[in-house]
Amino acid sequence: MSLNHHFRRLAALVGVLLGVSVLLGACSKPTGAGGSQPVILNVGATAEPTGLDPATTTGAGTPFVLLYNVYETLVRINDQGEIKPLLAKSWTVSPDATVYTFDLEPSATFASGSPVDAQAVVDSLLRIRDGKDTTQVLRSQMEKVKEVTAVDEHQVRVTLTGPSQQWLYDMTSTAGIIYDLGAATDLSTTPAGSGPYVFSSHDVGSSVTLKRNENYWGTGPRVDEVNFRYYADANAMVTAMLSGQLDIVSNLTVPQAVDQFSDAARFKVLEGTTDGEVVLGFNHVNPALQDVRVRQAINHAIDRQAIIDGAWGGKGTLIGSMVPPTDRWYEDLSRTYPHDPEKARALLAEAGHAEGLTLRLRVPNLPYAPPIARLVAAQLREVGIEVVTEELEFATWLESVYKQRDYDMTVVAHVEPWDLAAFARSDYYWGYDNPEFTELMAAADATTTEAEHTATLKKAAKVLADDAAADWLFLLPNIIITTTEVSGIAANGTGLSFDLTHVATSR
């Protein structure tokens, strides 16, 4: 989760991965934006923004729509998980890895016409670090920032309290957004950024509309208007795609339906990877779940391949940790706790629960979570754990589970990049506190070489897996369906944004 961040895409993926789709129904001429007829892109999505100010809003729905489209960052992440320039054309790092100097794009402007200058960058970064309404996750990502200084109009220097491998990566996402704070607007209702699109409207419960930024400082977008339309039923999106109402399903959240798009004359199917770890999360405040034997029992009780097959059409990757294969410190830890119901029963008896145990499993009503919850509940009952399941509206889940921590177990996809660090925060909604793991994460962040960073994070991931801090069920695939006219969509979902920068249609 960062969840804020953390729902750093939940989907955006499902949820962040959250099943999404793009409808190009009303597109006319292939001349693109600026032609005689407007090019309109309609995007069907399952995760609606719970707010429009990324600094104060949790959930993946907000960055899914706004990040890189309306708001830009100094640096961005590409579909291969690499950090690339955006508002900063280049940057340097001091030998001790504590001072970052960013050289800004001199031509960059906000949609209002104001320059994206050094002072705008300073004000935006300090807003995240010092803002009283900034989400907890974003504040934690800026904790290491000691000072932000405008060296001159187009250069910014950021001084950290110590070396941090994580910090620059965090700057590719919500924590690194540069806001037009001088705009005469309330950012909670009217986003104001420098991206290729401008915010137009939000019809709560229905849609968000973006329009082409006619004064964009970079290469302009190839569509004139984007309508993100929200579906509570992922199958309804499939039906809409098949009937010609949609032109893109930008993360198929009913993978069983992929065979319905086999007509190569009409559809293209892209299959990539994501950062979306589907986690059976534990509330470590619960006395029973504080016992590692109970957590290990749950891990042994779960048949993860059966969950992939039964809930996700056989699509997905077993991982066994909070590290996706696209991270350089990935190791396959999926056999740490093999499916072994007898071992699970023995561990429960050893922990004093031979007569059984009852736990609440509260999940968001995102496409992947309820079917997974039903399978998890059935498998746990086989070893003597009675599971009381409850499906919640996503906004309710964020308030009750994520903020108030009113749950025993939950299922959610954490889709933000480099999110292993979330387990090092005892104030996070899991309430996990393992000094050995926390020390390893701090040591990894303070390394100054890639090799040291990788080796230390591998150790940390292994400690986390051995401690059964959660049950990492599987990694979500990124399954995208488009019409044959659509181009410019990356197969991998490695960030929180549904990036429209290069999307086009030949229709």
Per-region residue spans from a language model:
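Alpha-helical secondary-structure segments
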Residues: 116-126, 153-159, 195-196, 223-225, ...
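Gly/Pro-rich hinge or "lid" segments in bacterial periplasmic/extracellular proteins
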Residues: 166-221, 225
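Ligand-site clamp/hinge motif
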Residues: 185, 213-259, 386
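Surface-exposed binding/hinge segments that line
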Residues: 96, 103, 137-181
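Long beta-strand-rich cores associated with HINT superfamily self-processing modules
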Residues: 480-507
